[in-house]
Amino acid sequence: MSQERFLTVPSTGEAARPFEDLLDEASAALPADFPTSAGQVLVALDIDGTILTPAGATPRVLEGIHGLATAGAHVLIASGRALEGVIPVLGALDFTDGWALCNNGATLVRVSGGTCEIVEERTFVPGPILEEIASAVPGSVFASMPHPDILLSAPFPNNEIEGSDHRIVSMEELASTPTPKIVVRAADMDREEFDRILSSLDVSRTHEVFVGWTSWADIEPLGVTKATGLESLRARLGVPAAGTVAVGDGTNDIAMIEWAAFGVAMGGASDEVRAHANHVTAAVENDGAAAVMHAIMRRCGVGGR
């Protein structure tokens, strides 16, 4: 049995299916005008619930990422994680060159020779939203991600915040420090109640709020999503819109799934996420993302199944 090394989404319990069937379904779902040249393809991959299991990435996922990249496709990571949480995943993927979108699109990172450099970043001063949320969500704790620091209002449960440079600071310091993302965690509240409360607050109209698979929310500047970050990068790289692919499972992936020419929801995605997708693949533990990548390789006539 593989040793668990990563804190990520637990298994969905989805029944396994033959990989060849998943590959054939993904191949059939690709748009008719999808490019046949890998150099005209951009594939954006979410991390948690998409390419990462607690034991790491599967061999098929690694084959897909490196097979596409070797063929000339632009394969990038698009995660809600801060850069500090993305770096260990890049290491596990042996992802040494390319691009990563962190903080749900607020932070664009160039990866070169295994070194990460922030190229663009959108920040905001959280100020009043912290007071509003703290009053409405009793017992909530906060994290702010101004690279390279991680500022916490109190320790997070189960070491849920990645990275080693944690500092417990006052709410005043959190409120006044520019950041690309604020995390809110309410460990003693169920997800549905947490989501309901946040949706009723002004912050849900003045900022982007993404609730995860637990009572955890990422808060970004209004208008900053994975889709906005990807569109900026697509234009920078000169990739045609018809060659864009996005694969994810969470509500923070909806924008990029809608943006892509081929938007894919994972098998572990909720009905809300699936409704925005062109195709639904298998869950992360059943190599759903790998099937999509191998289907693109097949369409482009490069190595793979």
Each PLM stretch: what is its role?
Residues 136-247, 251-259:
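Conserved acidic, metal-coordinating active-site core of Asp-based
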Residues 59-159:
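Active-site phosphate-binding/coordination module
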Residues 33-34, 38, 58, 220-305:
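Mg2+-dependent phosphoryl-transfer enzymes with acidic/Ser/Thr/Gly-rich catalytic loops
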Residues 27-75:
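N-terminal glycine-/serine-/threonine-rich phosphate-binding loop
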Residues 1-47, 239:
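Non-catalytic pre-domain segments flanking phosphatase-related domains
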Residues 72-76, 96-98, 181, 242-244, ...:
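Short active-site oxyanion
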Residues 49, 81, 248-250:
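Active-site metal-binding loops of divalent metal-dependent hydrolases
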Residues 95-96, 104, 205, 259-260, ...:
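Short, structured coil segments at secondary-structure junctions
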